């Protein structure tokens, strides 16, 4: 877990107006640029920038939550799931309404095989912001791996409501229908998905591993 509680971050924020100077503003801007990937997608640069923001403590709880979340994304990319989980936990502590952090933590739980916790986090992300198709897609993957096929199909269909030509959702629904023994509609979904994107099978497998 990161070193800053909500109380600590709020206390620091209250004194920024007194202690801040031009050099500090410039430094913080650079650190934020690194943390957001604005200086290139080099993972160690992003981690360094986010860590500097976090340990500096000169931002609001929501901004600090963003730094924890961004660093968690990079740790996940590096396969350091426990570190990513710690950062997402801290992001949610700092900003309990942070839908992306719940979604990202759900991904970690799913990759660790804890489908119930993953689904609970996806539920929370969707409750906070139901306008993001990726949240439904990620929950569909978790339901698929849990072999809860009807719920998986329902979530793939939610993604298709956003975009009926979403090849990944079509392919995923087809895969689940085949698993249920519905070969006709399952094969049709897969064929439609491949017509949209010939590489969809590989991309679907990749999305399930991320």
Where are these regions (language model features)?
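N-terminal leader/linker segments that initiate helical-solenoid repeat arrays
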Residues: 20-58
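Terminal, low-structured helical/coil segments at or just beyond the last alpha-helical repeat
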Residues: 29-34, 178-179, 183-210
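Conserved alpha-helical positions within TPR/SEL1-like repeat arrays
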Residues: 36, 66-76, 89, 100-110, ...
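Structural marker of alpha-solenoid helical repeat scaffolds
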Residues: 56, 60, 94, 128, ...
């Amino acid at each position: 877990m990161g070193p800053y509680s909500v109380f600590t971050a709020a206390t620091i924020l209250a004194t920024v107006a007194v202690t801040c100077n031009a050099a500090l503003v410039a430094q913080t801007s650079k650190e934020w640029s690194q943390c957001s990937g604005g200086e290139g997608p080099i993972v160690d640069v992003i981690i360094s920038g986010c860590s500097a923001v976090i340990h500096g403590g000169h931002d609001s709880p929501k901004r600090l939550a963003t730094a924890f979340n961004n660093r968690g994304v990079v740790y996940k990319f590096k396969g350091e799931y426990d570190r990513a989980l710690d950062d997402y936990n801290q992001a949610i502590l700092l900003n309990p309404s942070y839908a992306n952090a719940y979604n990202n933590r759900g991904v970690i739980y799913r990759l660790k095989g804890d489908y119930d916790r993953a689904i609970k986090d996806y539920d929370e992300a969707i409750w906070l912001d139901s306008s993001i198709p990726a949240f439904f897609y990620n929950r569909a993957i978790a339901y698929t791996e849990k072999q809860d096929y009807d719920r998986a199909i329902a979530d793939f269909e939610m993604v298709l409501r956003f975009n009926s030509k979403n090849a990944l959702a079509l392919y995923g629904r087809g895969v689940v229908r085949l698993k249920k023994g519905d070969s006709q509609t399952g094969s049709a979904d897969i064929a439609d998905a491949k017509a949209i994107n010939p590489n969809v099978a590989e991309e679907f497998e990749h999305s399930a591993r991320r």
